[in-house]
């Protein structure tokens, strides 16, 4: 905080006038204008925010303080305008009062630190600006020729300093020497110093005086003063030779003073000659604010006191206001500083001393400085002077006292002994501590902490008891002075406040006017010859008047306006006068010369508009107020603020759109946010699922699943990662405002919302990390589903996409518990009617007929009606929902009726893997879907079929998964069979999945399981996933289906299935295999090699786990049917493991002979990865890349990614260039699939759903072309495999 104190001379001599800009002004008015100009210039600088302005006059205290510590800026300006000239020119007393006002605050803040060193960073910079006329100094006892500052002991703490001022207080004076006549104002050169006694006072404090001769010079002086207002302290620099030269010179001078004004004359040759010679000078060192602390400066080292502190002294000797620093000559080498050792650096104001140092231009030389203390007998350096590297300024470096002895000790402590000093180094350090003033110890401790000295060593080197260097008497004295100064300042502020509250006469500025005589009088004013001589004499006596200024008289009494409404209010003596005024007012209502008495206001009151507005009457109301229009339905002027986004991002806000490939509402591809699934890659996982899709806690042995899997896994607490966010595509078209018509039917539009219950998101991406299958995305299919009155679900579905995804939900079952908690989908009791636009038909050329599949599966209409029964209490019907609303509706655990019975809700767009895990908790996450076939395991061997609508053309059915888990104590193994909708369960547990649609029968009542022959499985759970499809029933399709069936049967393939309670028979491809009994062991599976579907089976051993992927070619539709049997056998001590199968394939329904072979042996395996060991002739072999080729392809794709991302960000809907660049992607199937998924995610990040759909469509088409090319190349081989 910078204090700027204006001391304005208010003596009577300030009434003299000066000629300023053609107008005569008094010195006091000029002084007021100078203060206002200073404030205006100061406000342009950066440091003006922390300024405090004070205003003092030459009056007696406390009336001399017009604005002190407590007054604000408004009070300062008001008091400045009201200053008046009266009193004496008591310069000395006024200066003393100004210093005392400043020193009171210093004593209570304690920034002077008496007896504890002098810290330059503890400062309160103050500038005292005296504006006077430079006349004689008149006091009450006479006129004096010099300034006398009276010594007053009223202010506490004055005896500690010899002078009344401090080292951060400077005095400047503006001495007005402006004449009363017109002169040339512009003066070249610098403004001279004044020769009055005030000049010597200014030089003592480190300031100067200005001799002001004109108003132009006054503005120059004010600009100079504004530049000098900088934080800093004033020091006195004196020259000094080394001690031997000083003693030699002292001996020759016979006791005379060796130090003269010009330095030391080196007459003796005992010492070196000084390299710099200068006179003692008082100059300022600038103490700048710290970089990190913008409010106050930060320092580390004090300047030593001029005396050695004595702990037994009862008082402190007085110090000089400005420290006297002795500069040692000649220069010495700059000391080597320790890293992180604190050093204070201050810039020195320009002077002859700094000029000589700069002229030396010595880079590594410095001049040491000391402070003389005659009491102790010797002086040691505490800093040095050194030029800046650019030789533009000189800096004062302040370090510890006797730093030449300290720095080598610290260097050895850090670099030589590594903070483990020996005893001799400790002795040296203790000797150094005893040789410095005690008040340096706290600063030295902070410096040692800065260089990372350990705390234990620091306590040993500098114990805290050395800080008590002041005697108790002096400490108590300083504390008492501080309290007294605080009380005195409060009393002074209260006196100032009271005297400012006293009423003052209003200030009125003197109004002046100039007289212009106009044209000069002509000589021939009178043309008559007899009168010309007489008037010529009178004309000669008239003196010309030029630039004469007169003072306009001010009315002292303002006549109030009179009202003559009541004539009895007029006094009798004023009747005659008032009648004349009334007559004049009546006959002439507007006076030519209006009275201005009502407009005469003081300047200070002219800007007070608030009081005028308060007293002003409110305007009258209107006679006929206008009615304000009320808008009944909102604000008609309010505009819809739709943000303009890039490309087609905001089109879905108006109405849901359909993409060309029918990927759900808004054209969002599956896996995108509008497709209700997490994007590619691992999603948020629940407790029990790792983020990367691997095994999590509570699910031992479970392989890593895809990113879509993580969004569907449920832990013990419920949903993990379920989202409640509504997509922008869920907003339908807005109805126009107005009343509803009578025939209006309310229909709730479909929304892509997520349930807030424990059910997790459905229809997520099914690609596992590491599964490079492109196009393995979820198909959002439309379904109209409603629960009938009798509780039976009815559904009608239509296909909207040619791609379907298999996303997996993992569930585990307790091995020791008698019941398994499962999450079942419950139907919302609210009846909802969904509206869908069935514009697009199925992309399937010849869709499978539902009646044909009923005939194939042996499900007749009679059986359908006969099986419609109530569901047991242990099972819960799967809820019906739309595919456009794939939300999990209230998944809640339910207890099964029998210990080993699992109720599996049909999941639209997702597939459920189930496992038997000993010791793991059971939780099945299911998404709400249309009702489907429930294949309930009977005796662990066969499954019974309830209704399921198999949707989507190229679906990815879940192949049969059997898990063999060892019982807790038995050696046998139980089988858990999971079959696809429409598949034929076999006796050996192999189910054949069909891509078909079965007509909706009634739900199946659960059949209790009979115990197995060898062992009892702990629990069993099965999962089922169905994809939606729409099949039209017409004669052409029926004929096509029948012809396909007959053709296949002609080739010798037949199949039949029987569902029984204890046994199951299955016949596939003419080879029958019958298993009777309760259990199937791994040895049984190994002995099934005679069957045709075991041709690709691979056995890993009798004790290990066996996994086989078997392609079966079913005669129903020309589609591929994969049956993979994953059996895991474990011992009694180990838990069972789960093996899942992701089977992704593309359909080609144009020909029944086009078959595709996929062999998958593990969860997330590639469609082209052969794990069987024996490849069939119809299998498409993958491209095998070496590591070098993969690395080269990866680098190529990285460079290509920049260009493709640039194409994604480019506005517009022409994606031809983007697709051309996508064709340049290199690598195997995994790398290309990952790259396409990354591009889809990037396009969705910019909300470019149509671009993502185009990329997905391009990739699917490319995959289909690849598959078609492979299949056409080997038709005969496929037929041979089918016949085998």
From Swiss-Prot:
GO terms for cellular component: INTAC complex; integrator complex; nucleus. It comes from Drosophila melanogaster. Component of the integrator complex, a multiprotein complex that terminates RNA polymerase II (Pol II) transcription in the promoter-proximal region of genes. The integrator complex provides a quality checkpoint during transcription elongation by driving premature transcription termination of transcripts that are unfavorably configured for transcriptional elongation: the complex terminates transcription by (1) catalyzing dephosphorylation of the C-terminal domain (CTD) of Pol II subunit Polr2A/Rbp1 and Spt5, and (2) degrading the exiting nascent RNA transcript via endonuclease activity. Residues 752-781, 803-824, 1053-1074, 1125-1141 have a biased composition (Low complexity). GO terms for biological process: RNA polymerase II transcription initiation surveillance; snRNA 3'-end processing; snRNA processing. It comes from the Eukaryota. It is found in: Nucleus. Keywords: Nucleus. Residues 653-824, 864-895, 1053-1086, 1125-1180 are annotated as: Disordered. Residues 690-721 have a biased composition (Gly residues). InterPro entries: INT_SG_DDX_CT_C, Integrator_subunit6, VWF_A, vWFA_dom_sf. This is Integrator complex subunit 6.
């Amino acid at each position: 905080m910078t204090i700027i104190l204006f001391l304005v001379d208010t003596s009577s001599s300030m009434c003299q006038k000066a000629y300023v800009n053609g107008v005569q002004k008094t010195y006091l008015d000029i002084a007021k204008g100078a203060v206002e100009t200073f404030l205006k210039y100061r406000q342009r600088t950066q440091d003006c925010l922390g300024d405090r302005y004070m205003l003092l006059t030459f009056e007696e205290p406390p009336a001399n303080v017009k604005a002190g510590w407590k007054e604000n800026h408004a009070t300062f300006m008001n008091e400045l305008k009201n200053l008046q000239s009266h009193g004496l020119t008591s310069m000395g007393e006024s200066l003393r009062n100004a210093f005392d006002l400043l020193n009171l605050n210093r004593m209570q803040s304690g920034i002077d630190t008496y007896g504890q060193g002098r810290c330059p960073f503890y400062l309160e910079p103050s500038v005292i600006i005296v504006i006077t006329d430079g006349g004689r100094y008149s006091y009450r006892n006479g006129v004096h020729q010099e300034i006398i500052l009276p010594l007053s002991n009223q202010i506490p703490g004055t005896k500690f300093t010899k002078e009344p001022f401090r080292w951060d207080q400077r005095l400047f004076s503006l001495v007005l020497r402006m004449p009363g006549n017109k002169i040339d104002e512009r003066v070249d050169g610098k403004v001279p110093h004044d020769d009055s006694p005030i000049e010597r006072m200014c030089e003592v404090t480190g300031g100067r005086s200005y001799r002001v001769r004109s108003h132009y010079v006054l503005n120059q002086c004010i600009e100079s003063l504004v530049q000098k207002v900088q934080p800093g302290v004033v020091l006195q620099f004196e020259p000094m030779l080394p001690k031997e030269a000083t003693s030699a010179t002292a001996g020759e001078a016979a006791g005379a003073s060796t130090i003269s004004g010009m330095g030391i004359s080196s007459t003796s040759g005992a010492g070196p000659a000084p390299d710099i010679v200068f006179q003692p000078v008082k100059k300022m060192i600038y103490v700048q604010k710290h970089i990190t602390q913008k409010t106050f400066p930060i320092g580390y080292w004090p300047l030593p006191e001029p005396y050695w502190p004595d702990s037994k002294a009862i008082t402190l000797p007085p110090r000089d206001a400005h420290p006297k620093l002795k500069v040692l000559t000649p220069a010495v080498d700059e000391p080597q500083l320790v890293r992180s050792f604190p050093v204070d650096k201050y810039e020195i104001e320009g002077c002859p001393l700094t000029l000589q140092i700069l002229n030396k231009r010595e880079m590594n030389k410095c001049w040491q400085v000391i402070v003389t203390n005659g009491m102790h007998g010797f002086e040691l350096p505490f800093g040095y002077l050194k030029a800046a590297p650019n030789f533009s300024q000189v800096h004062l470096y302040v370090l510890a006292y006797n730093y030449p002895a300290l720095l080598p000790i610290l260097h050895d402590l850090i670099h030589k002994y590594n903070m483990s000093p020996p005893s001799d180094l400790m002795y040296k350090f203790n000797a150094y501590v005893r040789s410095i003033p005690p008040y340096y110890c706290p600063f030295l401790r902070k410096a040692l902490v800065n260089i990372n000295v350990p705390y234990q060593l620091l306590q040993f080197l500098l114990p805290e008891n050395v800080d008590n260097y002041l005697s108790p008497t002096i400490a108590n004295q300083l504390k008492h002075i501080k309290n007294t100064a605080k009380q005195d300042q409060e009393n002074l502020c209260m006196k100032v406040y009271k005297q400012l509250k006293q009423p003052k006469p209003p200030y009125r500025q003197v109004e002046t006017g100039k007289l212009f005589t106009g044209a000069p009088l002509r000589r021939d004013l009178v043309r008559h010859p007899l009168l010309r001589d007489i008037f010529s004499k009178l004309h000669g006596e008239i003196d010309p008047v030029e630039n004469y200024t007169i003072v306009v008289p001010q009315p002292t009494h303002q006549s109030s306006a009179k009202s003559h409404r009541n004539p009895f209010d007029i006094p009798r003596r004023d009747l005659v006068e008032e009648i004349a005024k009334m007559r004049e007012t009546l006959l002439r209502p507007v006076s030519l010369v209006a009275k201005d008495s009502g407009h005469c206001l003081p300047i200070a009151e002219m800007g007070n508009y608030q009081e005028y507005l308060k007293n002003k009457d409110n305007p009258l109301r209107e006679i006929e107020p206008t009615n304000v229009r009320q808008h009944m339905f909102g604000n008609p002027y309010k505009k819809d603020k739709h943000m303009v986004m890039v490309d087609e991002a905001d089109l879905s806000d108006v109405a849901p759109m359909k993409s060309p490939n029918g990927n759900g509402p808004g054209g969002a591809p599956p896996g995108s946010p509008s497709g209700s699934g997490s994007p590619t890659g691992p999603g948020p996982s629940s407790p029990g699922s790792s983020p990367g899709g691997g095994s999590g806690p509570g699910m031992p042995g479970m392989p890593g699943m895809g990113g879509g899997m993580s969004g569907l896994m449920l832990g013990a607490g419920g949903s993990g990662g379920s989202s409640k966010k509504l997509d922008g595509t869920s907003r339908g078209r807005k109805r126009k405002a107005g009343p509803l018509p009578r025939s209006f039917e309310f229909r709730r539009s479909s929304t892509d919302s997520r349930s807030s219950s424990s059910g997790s998101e459905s229809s997520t991406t099914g690609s596992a990390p590491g599964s490079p299958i492109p196009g393995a995305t979820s198909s959002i299919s439309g379904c109209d589903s409603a629960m009938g009155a009798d509780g039976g679900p009815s559904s009608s579905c239509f296909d909207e996409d040619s791609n379907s995804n298999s996303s997996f939900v993992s569930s585990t079952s307790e091995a020791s518990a008698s019941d398994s908690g499962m999450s079942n989908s419950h139907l919302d009791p609210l009846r909802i009617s969904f509206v869908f636009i069935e514009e697009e038909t199925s992309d399937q050329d010849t869709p499978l007929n539902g009646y044909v599949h009923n005939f194939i599966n042996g499900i007749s209409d009679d059986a359908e009606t006969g099986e419609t029964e109530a569901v047991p209490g242990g099972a819960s019907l799967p809820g019906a929902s739309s595919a456009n609303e794939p939300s999990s509706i209230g998944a809640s655990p339910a207890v099964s009726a029998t210990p080993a019975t699992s109720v599996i809700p049909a999941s639209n767009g997702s597939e459920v893997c189930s496992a038997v895990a000993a010791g793991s908790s059971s939780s099945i996450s299911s998404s709400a879907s249309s009702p489907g076939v429930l294949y309930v395991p009977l005796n662990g061997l066969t499954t019974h079929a309830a209704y399921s609508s198999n949707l989507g053309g190229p679906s990815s059915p879940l192949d049969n998964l059997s898990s063999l888990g060892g019982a807790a104590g038995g050696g046998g193994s139980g089988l858990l069979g999971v079959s696809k909708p429409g598949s034929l369960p076999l006796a050996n547990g192999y189910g054949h999945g069909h891509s078909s649609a079965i007509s909706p029968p009634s739900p199946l009542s659960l059949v209790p399981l009979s115990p197995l022959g060898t062992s009892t499985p702990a629990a069993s759970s099965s999962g089922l996933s169905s994809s939606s499809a729409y099949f039209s029933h017409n004669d052409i399709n029926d004929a096509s289906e029948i012809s396909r069936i007959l053709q296949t049967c002609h080739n010798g393939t037949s199949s039949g299935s029987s569902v029984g309670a204890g046994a199951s028979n299955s016949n596939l491809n003419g080879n029958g295999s019958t298993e009777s009994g309760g259990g199937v062991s791994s040895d049984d599976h190994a002995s099934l090699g005679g069957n045709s579907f075991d041709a690709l089976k691979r056995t890993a051993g009798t004790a290990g786990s066996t996994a086989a992927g078997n392609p079966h070619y079913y005669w129903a539709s020309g589609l591929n049917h994969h049956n993979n049997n994953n059996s895991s056998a474990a011992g009694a001590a180990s838990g069972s493991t789960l093996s899942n199968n992701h089977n992704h394939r593309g359909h080609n329904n144009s020909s029944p002979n086009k078959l595709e072979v996929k062999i998958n042996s593990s969860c997330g395996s590639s469609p082209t990865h052969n794990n069987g060991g024996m490849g069939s002739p119809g299998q498409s072999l993958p491209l095998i890349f070496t590591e070098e080729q993969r690395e080269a392809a990866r680098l190529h794709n990285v460079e290509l990614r920049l260009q493709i991302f640039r194409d994604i960000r480019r506005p517009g809907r022409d994606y031809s260039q983007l697709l051309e660049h996508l064709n340049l992607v290199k690598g195997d199937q995994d790398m290309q699939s990952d790259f396409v998924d990354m591009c889809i995610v990037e396009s969705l990040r910019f909300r470019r759903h149509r671009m993502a759909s185009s990329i997905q469509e391009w990739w699917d088409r490319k995959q289909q072309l690849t598959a078609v090319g492979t299949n056409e190349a080997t038709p005969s081989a496929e037929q041979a495999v089918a016949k085998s």
